[in-house]
Amino acid sequence: MKKYDIVIGKQFGIINGEKNIVFIKTGRGGTIEGFKNKYLNICDFLFKKYGYTFVVSANPKDSVCDLEEEIKSVDKYVGDYKEIYFVGISNGASIGAAQCSKIEKIKNAVLINAPLMINFHKIKEGAKKFRGNNMYFLYGEDDPSCRYIEILDSIKNTACKYKIIKGEGHDFSKESLIYELNYFLTG
């Protein structure tokens, strides 16, 4: 069975690579493995293709996330890197939208099914301040937030874009995640 190179408590799983970090923040209640090892399998597949360092961060139900602190806490385990690709799932996407602008090394973010009906003001404010190259909001066509997707047009930042993924709901399949992350990592 595949394993992370480093596991820090139940909070972080790391596959060590080179150059860049892909930092994945799971949805509320998400573990570093994900359902049926989804995150571990995705990281392993993409690591073999790109060789980047992958960090998966759990999202315990009753926790408050400080993304900057989380990244600092794994720095000593991942070595030197040029930039961070941030991937957020559901609540992890909301966290990314609200907090990525505070972290200079995050140049690109993909935010999957961030709930738009919960604290949208935080999503909007953070995304408006994002100084990176791209902040992609992805929504499954059957995700409850998809019907509100046009509210993202109120974010005045040319880096922010959104896309609807046909045939997906709130929980993207492993195959769809790999496809979208492949596209994201190759620009």
Model regions: which residues?
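Catalytic histidine-centered segment of alpha/beta-hydrolase-like enzymes
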Residues: 168-178
